């Protein structure tokens, strides 16, 4: 069955909504996935604000199926530091005090659910962040208790958000991705277990974040058929031979030819 193909606007945050919609239509897309904060301010409560967005989409014959709140979501469970200032809006970063950043990020994620309702969509795609990503490699030794506390922290922060989403009939789709509480099949299962399989929580499936890790990205679909709420289509290449920079990335930038893996456009990778 053919499905609509939409353009996620996050990478075009420097362009006004009207411009990116015009381009998306000319590129042949069926719709857009509106990215926060550049193309949607979920703090707005005036229905006219959301009507104007719909008018813009209708002007170009574009559909809307979900909105994205990745950057703010990252600040919910992360241990906040100076890196976050570069990706967070000023109204989330504030004075940079971690407790304040966490609280404002949670509030904004709940506002995103209300915005989704105003726009007539039922899915918010985003990140969660993770208090335990820094312990990915088990040296110095990482205990089960430390890891379990990380998942408990995720549950404490996200269950109240998910409860609000459920009341509104909106779902949260975590993009399974490095630096999030779920970054492969095993951690995705642990995340679901931590929140007792909350009905408002599922996944945004992007196999490009799984393949280079050695994760069976087809099996992921089989494991969570009812929890995949949205899909991102992106490709990734990983080398058939050893490289100078391994799977961890070697503190190099994306695109470096010495890397074992790099993201690529559809059809130019190995997915």
Per-segment meaning from a language model:
Residues 18-37, 118-123:
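Catalytic domains of carbohydrate-active enzymes, especially glycoside hydrolases
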Residues 14, 18, 59, 76-203:
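Active-site acidic/histidine proton-transfer and metal-coordination neighborhood
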Residues 34-58, 73, 128-135:
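Glycine-rich, proline-tolerant flexible connector loops at the mouths of alpha/beta enzymes
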Residues 1-15:
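Boundary/entry segment of secreted carbohydrate-active catalytic domains
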Residues 19, 31-32, 67, 148-265:
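Acidic/histidine-rich catalytic cores of soluble enzymes
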Residues 42-64, 142-145, 170, 259-262:
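Short acidic, glycine/proline-enriched helix-loop-strand junctions
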Residues 269-271:
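A short, acidic, amphipathic alpha-helical segment used as a generic capping/interface helix at domain edges
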Residues 11-13, 36-38, 70-73, 128-132, ...:
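Active-site-proximal loop/turn and secondary-structure-junction residues that shape catalytic pockets
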């Amino acid at each position: 069955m053919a499905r609509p193909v939409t353009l996620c606007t996050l990478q075009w945050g420097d362009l006004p909504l009207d411009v990116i919609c015009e381009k998306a239509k000319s590129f042949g897309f069926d719709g857009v996935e509106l990215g926060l904060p550049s193309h949607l301010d979920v703090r707005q409560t005036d229905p006219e604000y959301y009507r104007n967005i719909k008018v813009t989409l209708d002007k170009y014959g574009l559909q809307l199926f979900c909105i994205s709140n990745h950057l703010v979501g990252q600040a919910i469970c992360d241990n906040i530091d100076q890196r976050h200032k570069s990706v967070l809006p000023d109204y989330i970063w504030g004075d940079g005090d971690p407790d304040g950043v966490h609280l404002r990020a949670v509030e904004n994620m709940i506002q995103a659910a209300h915005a989704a309702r105003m726009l007539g969509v039922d899915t918010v795609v985003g990140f969660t962040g993770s208090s335990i990503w820094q312990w990915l490699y088990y040296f110095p030794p990482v205990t089960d208790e430390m890891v379990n506390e990380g998942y408990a922290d995720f549950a404490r922060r996200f269950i109240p958000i998910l409860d609000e989403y459920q009341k509104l009939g909106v779902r949260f789709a975590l993009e399974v991705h490095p630096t999030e509480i779920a970054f492969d099949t095993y951690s995705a299962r642990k995340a679901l277990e931590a929140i007792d399989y909350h009905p408002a929580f599922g996944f945004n499936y992007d196999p490009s974040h799984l393949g280079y890790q050695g994760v069976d990205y087809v099996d992921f679909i089989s494991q969570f058929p009812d929890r995949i709420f949205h899909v991102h289509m992106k490709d990734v290449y990983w080398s058939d031979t050893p490289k100078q920079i391994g799977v961890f990335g070697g503190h190099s930038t994306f695109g470096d030819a010495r890397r074992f893996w790099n993201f690529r456009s559809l059809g130019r990778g190995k997915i």
